[in-house]
């Protein structure tokens, strides 16, 4: 289409100049964006790129307050004055440390969850939103679970698991290295899938410009992420 042709012509002449302020949820900022940002800066050296990170609700607030131009969030809730565009698929998994003293099988049921000590992401995080929604499919609530701690980042959860006998709920993208190294193991929660989407988020009516350039660039590179 015309926009795609225009995008490719600008690419050819490397004509993109200006400032692009990104905001991304913690999981996306830590585990998805770094290689993408590096490639983008190499391709568009005249674009002044900046990134802030926080949980998904915080990113949406920053967008509404015009502190950023484009957000990337992982939640399932939608605000009516924002436009959401799908970017990547993700999945949450339950993990324990490889040397945990928890008496836990490799496969459990949702009904087992109230008996297992948990460490979870904080309120306002997309990760907790998705976990709560999955619980509700089995008539379970957070208040019925044994939550030891709510922490502000996945890295904090992984460190907590090293020193505490409990189970964490995190993005599969965040634990790839630990699973390969054998430091963590996945516990399957039977019949409780926790798929989600990472989404771009923009103010309604403010689409275009460098935000659109970044979204197109990310779309072209999404298969390698």
Label each residue range with its predicted role.
Residues 32, 187-225:
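A late-sequence structural motif
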Residues 1-13:
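Alpha-helical linker/hinge and terminal dimerization helices associated
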């Amino acid at each position: 289409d015309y926009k795609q042709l225009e995008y490719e012509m600008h690419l050819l002449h490397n004509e993109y100049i200006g400032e692009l302020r990104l905001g991304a949820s913690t999981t996306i900022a830590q585990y998805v964006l770094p290689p993408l940002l590096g490639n983008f800066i190499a391709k568009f050296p005249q674009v002044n790129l900046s990134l802030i990170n926080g949980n998904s609700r915080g990113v949406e607030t920053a967008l509404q307050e015009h502190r950023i131009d484009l957000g990337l969030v992982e939640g399932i809730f939608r605000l009516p004055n924002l436009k959401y565009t799908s970017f990547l698929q993700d999945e949450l998994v339950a993990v324990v440390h490889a040397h945990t003293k928890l008496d836990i099988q490799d496969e459990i049921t949702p009904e087992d969850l109230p008996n297992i000590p948990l460490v979870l992401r904080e309120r306002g995080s997309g990760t907790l939103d998705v976990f709560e929604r999955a619980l509700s499919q089995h008539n379970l609530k957070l208040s019925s679970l044994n939550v030891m701690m709510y922490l502000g980042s996945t890295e904090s959860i992984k460190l907590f698991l090293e020193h505490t006998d409990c189970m964490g709920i995190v993005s599969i993208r965040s634990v790839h290295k630990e699973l390969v190294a054998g430091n963590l193991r996945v516990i399957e929660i039977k019949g409780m899938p926790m798929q989600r989407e990472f989404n771009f988020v923009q103010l309604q009516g403010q689409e275009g410009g460098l935000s659109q350039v970044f979204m197109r660039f990310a779309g072209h590179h999404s298969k390698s992420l």
